[in-house]
Amino acid sequence: MINFKKQIMKKTTFFLCAMLLVSSILIAPRSSLAYPFWAQQNYESPREATGKIVCANCHLAQMPTIAEVPQAVGADSVFKAVVKIPYKDDIKEIGADGSEVPLQVGAVVMLPDGFKLAPQERWTDEIKEETEGVYFTNYSEEKENIIIVGPLPGDTNKEIIFPVLSPNPATNKEYHYGKYSLHIGGNRGRGQVYPTGDKSNNVIFTSSSAGTINSIETIEDGSYQINIENENGEITTEAVPVGPKLIVKEQDQITVGAPLTSDPNVGGFGQLDAEVVLQSPYRIIGLIAFFIGVGLTQILLVLKKKQVEKVQAAEGI
């Protein structure tokens, strides 16, 4: 009887936890499912064949992203890939509920095959301090060379440090020394389009028809319905969600594609490529040996020249 009660309690607890998880997913506003999770859910790879990172499909505005990586790294070594996501301080954007919220940022770093996020036991104290509060995830279980971060509070994360571990060709013959490319993307703010193709409330809304604005209705949740009457007396209704500010009024004459709202977007996405050389230790040793050889040759030439000068002086030449 006691075991039966325990089983009932376990099943009840599991059921409640499952319901809580499902409810949190369904009830959570769309902004909580922001970059980069939708990219993971909708694209096998974050980079298209054209070279475009898929985040640009939803984040239509372009803004700069800066990356700093070492020119060369050694095998089986930890180095920092720094992604900078600049924007003006104290900027706020429109949240999914129409309220003003601080900007969030995110980044994706596509490393060459064999490179991956360095294990935490190999992080230096400096890296641990610089990455405090930052949670790194792989794009998928099969792609550990693709690291994503975000969304994070933008005010304190305009510079994101990625600790990267390089491969060792000496122990894994799949990898080789040489030059490799990295593909990097950085985003600030919400997107303008959802992966479903629907507009978010972080974009300009335009008219799909020409005519006169017959009426503007304010809905209980703060959104609008704009009724446009064309020259034939037909009414087209444009729905504007809560957030964007209307720039039209009743009796305004508008054309197809005319803006109905201001542009609320203050963010944007940017991508770039970088290069890093996986340096062979034998090449470094060879380079050092070459410089030593050149130095010794120069010294021998100077000594030989002085010897010749002494002989010439002795012979009175």
From Swiss-Prot:
It is found in: Cellular thylakoid membrane. The chain crosses the membrane at residues 284-304. PROSITE patterns: CYTF. It holds the Pfam family Apocytochr_F_C. Residues 1-34 form the signal peptide. It is a single-pass membrane protein. It comes from the Bacteria. InterPro entries: Cyt-f_TM, Cyt_f, Cyt_f_lg_dom, Cyt_f_lg_dom_sf, Rudment_hybrid_motif. Its cofactor is heme. GO terms for cellular component: plasma membrane-derived thylakoid membrane. Keywords: Electron transport, Heme, Iron, Membrane, Metal-binding, Photosynthesis, Signal, Thylakoid, Transmembrane, Transmembrane helix, Transport. The keyword Transmembrane applies. Heme binds at residues 35, 55, 58-59. The keyword Transmembrane helix applies. Component of the cytochrome b6-f complex, which mediates electron transfer between photosystem II (PSII) and photosystem I (PSI), cyclic electron flow around PSI, and state transitions. Belongs to the cytochrome f family. The 4 large subunits of the cytochrome b6-f complex are cytochrome b6, subunit IV (17 kDa polypeptide, PetD), cytochrome f and the Rieske protein, while the 4 small subunits are PetG, PetL, PetM and PetN. The complex functions as a dimer. This is Cytochrome f.
